[in-house]
Amino acid sequence: MSQSTPLTVFVLSDSVGQTALQLAQAALAQYPNVKPDIIRFPFVHSVDKLTDVLSKAVPEETIVVHTLATTGLSEIAQNYCDAKKIASFDMMSPLTKLITAKTSLAPSGEAGALHHLNDRYFDRISAMEFAVMYDDGKDPHGFLEADIVLLGVSRTSKTPLSLFLANRNIKVANLPIVPQAHIPDEIWHVDPKKIIGLMNTPEVLNNIRRERMIAYGLNPDTTYSDMDEIKAELDFAQDLYDKIGCQVINVANRSIEETAAIILEQTGLDFASSSTDHVN
C-alpha cells in the first residue's frame, strides 16, 4: 500500500466558506494518495483577522484557497502569501475579472452577495451552518463571532435553542459546562450581554437524564443522573455565570419556544429577528 502524502489546506472566506470548501474538496478528491487536513476560516471580514489566519500557515506544508469578495481582501491575501512564499489560489478574482471585462461593470465587493438572491433565506441558512459549526464548543473562535453564546450543563437545551434561534437568522454558539473543565479564554472576551447561562432544577434535570439513558438502553442509575453530581454541576455553572456577569434563564418546564422568546427579549434581538418570521 502506498503511503499517503499529508497536505494542509486553509479555506478562507468572508462569508460562510461553503463554496470554497466544496471546490477544494472536489479538487482534492482527484488525489487519492493525498491525506488532506482542511481547515475552514469563515467570516474573515477584516485585514487584522485575515493576517492573523495567514500567519498560522506553514509555507512548506500549506495551500491557502480563498473566496474573499470584500474589496481589497483578496489582493492583501495574495500579496501576503507571495511575500511569505505560501502557495495560494484565489477562487473569486479571476472570474470576477472576466465578468468585468465582458460587462464593463465592477463587482460590488460585498461579502456573501450571493445571499442577496433572497437575503432572509440565505441569512437563515448561514445562521444554521454557524450553529452547527460552533455547536458544543467545537471551535472557541465562534464565541467571538456569535450574536448569542449559550452556556449550560448537559441537557439544558443548548443545541435545540441554538438551532431554533438560527431559524430567526441569529448566529448562536454554545458551550457545555462541566465542573473543573477549562473554560475557553474567548468566553472572557465576549460581551456578557451576549451570553446566556442556562439553568435547570436538579429534579427536572435528573428526570431528563434518566429518561435519556433509558432511551439509549443504558442503566439510568449512573453518575450522570446522580442527584448530588447534578447539584454540583449546577452550582459550578451558577458560580461561572456570576463571574461572567451574564443573564441566567432557568429552562425547567419551559418549551424551547418560550425560552427562546425570553432570550430574544433579554438580548434585545426580538425586534431585529421579527422581520424574518414569515419567510417561506
From Swiss-Prot:
It is an enzyme of class 2 (transferase). InterPro entries: Kinase-pyrophosphorylase, PPDK_reg. GO terms for molecular function: ADP binding; ATP binding; phosphotransferase activity, phosphate group as acceptor; protein serine/threonine kinase activity. ADP binds at G152, V153, S154, R155, T156, S157, K158, T159. It comes from the Bacteria. It catalyses: N(tele)-phospho-L-histidyl/L-threonyl-[pyruvate, phosphate dikinase] + ADP = N(tele)-phospho-L-histidyl/O-phospho-L-threonyl-[pyruvate, phosphate dikinase] + AMP + H(+); N(tele)-phospho-L-histidyl/O-phospho-L-threonyl-[pyruvate, phosphate dikinase] + phosphate + H(+) = N(tele)-phospho-L-histidyl/L-threonyl-[pyruvate, phosphate dikinase] + diphosphate. Pfam families: Kinase-PPPase. The keyword Kinase applies. Its EC number is 2.7.11.32, 2.7.4.27. Keywords: Kinase, Nucleotide-binding, Serine/threonine-protein kinase, Transferase. Belongs to the pyruvate, phosphate/water dikinase regulatory protein family. PDRP subfamily. HAMAP family: PDRP. Bifunctional serine/threonine kinase and phosphorylase involved in the regulation of the pyruvate, phosphate dikinase (PPDK) by catalyzing its phosphorylation/dephosphorylation. This is Putative pyruvate, phosphate dikinase regulatory protein 1. The lineage of its organism: Bacteria, Bacillati, Bacillota, Bacilli, Lactobacillales.
